[in-house]
Amino acid sequence: KQVHNPKVLPLSMIFQDPMTSLNPLRTVGFHLREVLRRFQPKLTKEEREVAILEMLNKVGISNPELRLKQFPFEFSGGMRQRIMIAMALLTKPDMLIADEPTTALDVTIQAQILALLKELQEQLGLTVVIVSHDFSVIAGICDQVYVMRNGLVLEHAPVDTIFAQSLHPYTQSLLKAARLEASQGPVPADRDDSQLV
C-alpha cells in the first residue's frame, strides 16, 4: 500500500518502451484516470477529468478529449512517450526518472521529448534523472553526469567536465567508443553493464 502513497515515494518513472508499459486493451483515458484514482483519491470525477486534460495539454497532446478515448496503438511512439510523461507527472512527483526516454524515436521526436522534459523540469521544479547510453541525450539535457558500471558510481561531474576532462578510464573508453560510432557507424561494444545518468 505504501508504494502508491506519494508522501512515501515522491518520485515517478518513465520506462524505456511506452508500448509495453501501457495496456493495449485499455484506453489512454483509463490509464490516466487510474493514476489519479491511486495517487489523488480525494479528487472528484470532474476534478480528475480537468487535471487530465490540463496535463495532456501541458505535454503537447492535441485534442485531448478525443485522445482519451483512443488506445495506445493509435498513437505514434513519440505521442505514447508523452502519455507516459503525463501519467508520471499526474502523481505530482518531486523526482522524475526517465529510463532511455528517447529509444526507438527518430531524431526529430527525440529532440521534442528532451525539450519537453527540460521545459517541465523548469516549470514544475522537478529533479529529472535520465538513464541513458546515448551521449547526445546526455549532452543535450543533463547538468550532472554519474557514470556507473555494475551498480557502482565510477565518476561524477558536471556534464561539460565529463565530456572535456573525464578522469576514469571507463568513462574515457565510453566517450572514445561514442566518438568512433558517430564517425563510422555502430562499434561492437559490451555496454550492458554501463549506465550514464
Give residue ranges: language-model regions.
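Charged, flexible cofactor/metal-binding loops and thiol motifs
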Residues: H4, S62-E65, P158-V197
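Hydrophobic anchor residue at the start of the ABC signature
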Residues: L32, I85, L96, I109, ...
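Helical segment within the ABC ATPase nucleotide-binding domain
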Residues: A111-L124
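A short, surface-exposed alpha-helical micro-motif characterized by mixed small hydrophobic
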Residues: I138-G140
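ABC ATPase "signature
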Residues: V153-A157
